Amino acid sequence: MMQSLSNVNFFQDGHFVFRNQFFFKGKAPSVSDSVFVIPGLVDVHVHLREPGFSYKETVKTGTAAAAAGGYTAVCSMPNLAPVPDTYENLKVQLDVIRRDAAIQVLPFGSITRGELGETLSDMEAMAPYVAGFSDDGKGVQSEKMMLEAMKLAKSLGKVISAHCEDNSLLHGGYIHAGRYAAAHGHKGISAESEWGPIARDLDLAAKTGCAYHVCHVSTAKSVDLIRQAKKSGVDVTCETGPHYLLLCDEDLQEDGRFKMNPPLRSPEDRDALVEGLQDGTVDMVATDHAPHSAEEKSRGLAGSLMGVVGLECAFPVLYTGLVETGKLSLEALVERMSLAPARRFGIDNQDCYAIFDLNAQEIIDPERFQSMGRATPFAGWNVHAAHVGTIYRGELLEKGRNA
């Protein structure tokens, strides 16, 4: 049955136009006048944890969380069991997606077998079914291995999406090697452990012509390297997360919900990421939604597993923290959270929309999340842009908590 919303601000051709009515299928949500209808959000970096770790999250709960945050397409990372390094292993995940996903899910195949960095995965067999290839959770340590992966990905027309981390520079660190780590006796992770591999890979991407994407950029030097590579014609894009744009190591608390990889960096790094988002060096925002069990996140900064959740609060926190403060236009936020990721990874997002009430206020409450994960550094934040509904392929999926 067709329904409609009246008096909406509709995103069209890069700007907002006023529409008297907006039609869709499903039960109409209860909303105020002048809500904003934007293209469905797209997240190219999500951990759905299934198969292998369904005590943390499932495809069903993860995509429900995505829909509750306005997302209509996500790309799932390959650190699973089995690792999708052959078509047979990938099919295990594809079958679950077909059965349980509420929205579009495009998985990544792994770059190397078992994400061990030793031999290439069966990329040819997986190519028709994946968004690209990544060893996310681990960096490809071997330059030779990454070179071979890029050559093969180039021939297949696929993106290499790289988790950039030099294991030789970690030294057991788990938060940023900055003032907080020094003051509180924590082991730090250097910025070079990220930007070093990025510099290496940018050279390889220039040589091979491979479409190269950098995951979860967190340092100022990384942004500068990518900016210069773009100017020289390298086919590179990158993402950063909401937490890197809005928080830094000065915001750390002795709580597992502040622990992720890469870690929250310095204020200068945060500011450089915002500048990169403004000038287009940082192409897109991805949450790196990485749920863990409550027990796994209850061991403080030193003992908790790395990873936070973000699908259900990303748009409100970024709207409040960047748009309302004048750092980014609403149109640019839509570009970074929907259009750019869909364009880079060839994602069909037609007839998919997210509806937000920009004036509605809410407090981020993880206990109300659809996700099985609860660990977010944004818990308790007072934000605007409450989610009203998500329309997937023309039909309303999720009304939102204020409907």
Which residues does each PLM region occupy?
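N-terminal metal-binding scaffold of metallo-dependent hydrolase/deaminase domains
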Residues: 1-30, 35
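C-terminal cap of metal-dependent C-N hydrolases
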Residues: 8, 300-303, 351-403
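Divalent metal-coordination and catalytic microenvironments
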Residues: 8, 21, 34, 45, ...
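Metal-associated gating/positioning segment near the N- to mid-region
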Residues: 35-100
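Active-site mouth loops of central-metabolism enzymes
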Residues: 44-57, 78-80, 106-119, 137, ...
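Histidine/acidic residue-rich metal-binding segments in metalloenzymes
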Residues: 120-285
